[in-house]
């Protein structure tokens, strides 16, 4: 997993509350057994005027010119600014996969659905909770200024505006450690590889018949 320390990027304002995971990545795209290939269908029902299906050539589809991600000024955005209860609905981990593959590493909102919030950390993304009044202010600034950028500093736990204002956010120490060091569940396990090997050696001496059956 890619480590996260400080990110500076263009902000895309998604001015909608209660965006659920089916809107983030629709159910028809969940049939793949891979973790990749979802970014092209992020917010599919909103980005396109025709219905999408897995494996489709999106270059031939009808783009919705009114949807925020399709506007030229937000191309290359890597920070998503959203409204309350972002990521509600089903627990599909495909939602952060799609956001991440599209290019978003940071999502800022007044609140998140719990499972989506947890899944972001597991996939190298930083979900930041800021007061609704602050999000309102950032929304206005983003709409008013083309190319508006924010900086998310995980080490210091602050969001920094172009004019130098800083907004503090909370993050669990363990999750912060994992993001800063690029550790997913597998990475965390590998950190304990020596202890795991020691345990296996002890168990092989204590219960050798179990390991003989496994080898067979």
Swiss-Prot record:
Lineage: Bacteria, Pseudomonadati, Pseudomonadota, Gammaproteobacteria, Moraxellales
GO molecular function, one term: 3-isopropylmalate dehydratase activity
Key words of the record: Amino-acid biosynthesis, Branched-chain amino acid biosynthesis, Leucine biosynthesis, Lyase
Keyword Amino-acid biosynthesis: yes
Reaction catalyzed: (2R,3S)-3-isopropylmalate = (2S)-2-isopropylmalate
Example GO BP: L-leucine biosynthetic process
Family designation: Belongs to the LeuD family. LeuD type 1 subfamily.
PANTHER family the record matches: 3-ISOPROPYLMALATE DEHYDRATASE SMALL SUBUNIT, 3-ISOPROPYLMALATE DEHYDRATASE SMALL SUBUNIT 2-RELATED-RELATED
Subunit text: Heterodimer of LeuC and LeuD.
Pathway as given in its UniProt record: Amino-acid biosynthesis; L-leucine biosynthesis; L-leucine from 3-methyl-2-oxobutanoate: step 2/4
Pfam families given in the database record: Aconitase_C
Record protein name field: 3-isopropylmalate dehydratase small subunit
Function: Catalyzes the isomerization between 2-isopropylmalate and 3-isopropylmalate, via the formation of 2-isopropylmaleate.
Group of enzyme by EC: lyase
Example of a GO cellular component annotation carried by this entry: 3-isopropylmalate dehydratase complex
The protein's Enzyme Commission number: 4.2.1.33
InterPro entries the record matches: 3-IsopropMal_deHydase_ssu, Aconitase/3IPM_dehydase_swvl, AconitaseA/IPMdHydase_ssu_swvl, IPMI_Swivel, LeuD
């Amino acid at each position: 997993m890619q480590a996260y320390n400080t990110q500076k990027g263009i902000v895309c304002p998604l001015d909608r509350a209660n965006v659920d995971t089916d809107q983030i990545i629709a159910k028809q795209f969940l049939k793949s057994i891979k973790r990749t290939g979802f970014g092209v269908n992020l917010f599919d029902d909103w980005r396109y005027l025709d219905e999408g299906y897995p494996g489709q050539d999106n270059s031939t589809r009808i783009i919705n010119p009114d949807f925020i991600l399709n506007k030229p000024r937000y191309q290359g955005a890597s920070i998503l600014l959203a409204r309350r209860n972002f990521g509600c609905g089903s627990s599909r981990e495909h939602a952060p996969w799609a956001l991440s593959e599209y290019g978003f590493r940071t999502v800022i909102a007044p609140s998140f659905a719990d499972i989506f919030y947890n899944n972001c950390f597991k996939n190298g993304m930083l979900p930041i909770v800021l007061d609704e009044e602050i999000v309102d202010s950032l929304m206005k600034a983003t709409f008013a200024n083309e190319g508006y950028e924010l900086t998310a500093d995980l080490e210091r736990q602050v969001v920094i505006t172009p004019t130098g204002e800083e907004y503090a956010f909370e993050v669990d120490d363990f999750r912060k450690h994992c993001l800063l060091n690029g550790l997913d569940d597998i990475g965390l396990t590998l950190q304990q590889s020596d202890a795991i090997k020691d345990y296996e050696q002890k168990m092989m001496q204590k219960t050798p018949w179990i390991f003989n059956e496994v080898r067979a």
